[in-house]
Amino acid sequence: MASIKPLGDRVVVEPKNESEEKIGSIIVPDTAKEKPQEGKVIAAGQGRYEDGKLVPLEVKVGDTVLYGKYSGTEIKQGGKDLLIIRESDILGVVTN
């Protein structure tokens, strides 16, 4: 299976897997659910250039991040739904 290497200040995020949701005895279809805004970074670019110097990304592979509701580009890779987003669209890193 091919892998994705994001360029520049982009990262590949695997959105948090939301389990099937029920309200009473009614199953809520995927189309009616809110998109998750939390996920795990599975690949990261090298960083961005500012004034001719490479500035490395603050997030790293393995970080759990929060991102904007409409951030990034959705893709499918190996049967998984993934998101490619810019580091600037990441709102924060979840820590335990």
UniProtKB/Swiss-Prot annotation:
Broad class of where this protein is predominantly found? cytoplasm
GO biological process annotation, one example: chaperone cofactor-dependent protein refolding
Q: Where are the transmembrane segments?
A: none
Q: Could you tell me the keywords of this UniProt record?
A: Chaperone, Cytoplasm
- A family per Pfam: Cpn10
The reply to whether Chaperone figures as a keyword in the UniProt entry is: yes
CDD domains per UniProt: cpn10 (cd00320)
Q: Which GO terms describe its molecular function?
A: ATP binding; metal ion binding; protein folding chaperone; protein-folding chaperone binding; unfolded protein binding
**Subcellular location(s) of the protein:** Cytoplasm
User: According to its record, what are the GO cellular component terms?
Assistant: cytoplasm
Q: How does it assemble?
A: Heptamer of 7 subunits arranged in a ring. Interacts with the chaperonin GroEL.
Which family does the record assign? Belongs to the GroES chaperonin family.
Q: What does this protein do?
A: Together with the chaperonin GroEL, plays an essential role in assisting protein folding. The GroEL-GroES system forms a nano-cage that allows encapsulation of the non-native substrate proteins and provides a physical environment optimized to promote and accelerate protein folding. GroES binds to the apical surface of the GroEL ring, thereby capping the opening of the GroEL channel.
Q: What is this protein called?
A: Co-chaperonin GroES
**Organism whose genome encodes this protein:** Leptospira biflexa serovar Patoc (strain Patoc 1 / ATCC 23582 / Paris)
The taxonomic lineage of its organism, from the top, reads: Bacteria, Pseudomonadati, Spirochaetota, Spirochaetia, Leptospirales
Gene encoding this chain?
Answer: groES
